[in-house]
Each structure stands twice: as structure tokens, then as C-alpha cells.
Amino acid sequence: MPLRLCQGRKDRASDPVRDDGSPPRLFVSQVCRRAPKDPQGFQGHRGGQNVGDCSPIFHQEKKQVMRRFYSLCEWK
């Protein structure tokens, strides 16, 4: 999945990596939509499209996901 998202998306201006090192918003959205929702109901801006909507499991694995994403994208 990340590999497909990476194709044609290397323009940092259009899809910037945030200062805290989190992946581009598009990638986060795709992961969050597939992740189990937080049962406590911490809703973000738009249903399921930001990290705040993800389950704690996603937060625990976030660095691993990011590492995989950057190695596939060659974004370093």
C-alpha cells in the first residue's frame, strides 16, 4: 500500500513531512481509515482521517510504519 501512495508523490511542497517527523497527511489518512477506531471516541477533525482517530495500537506502531514508509518511498 505505501508503495502505491508514494508513486508521483515526492513533491515535498504539495505533501510535506511534518516537523515532528510524522508521515505525509495522505499516508496517515490511509492508515487511519484501516485502523480500528479508538473506543474512547477521541474524534479528530474529519471522521477517521487524522492520527487522533487511530487506535492506541497505531500509535505504538507509528515509528515502525514510518520507517517502512520512508524506506519504500526513498524519502529519508
Swiss-Prot record:
It comes from the Viruses. Residues 1-24 are annotated as: Disordered. Residues 8-22 have a biased composition (Basic and acidic residues). This is Uncharacterized protein 054L. It comes from Frog virus 3 (isolate Goorha) (FV-3).
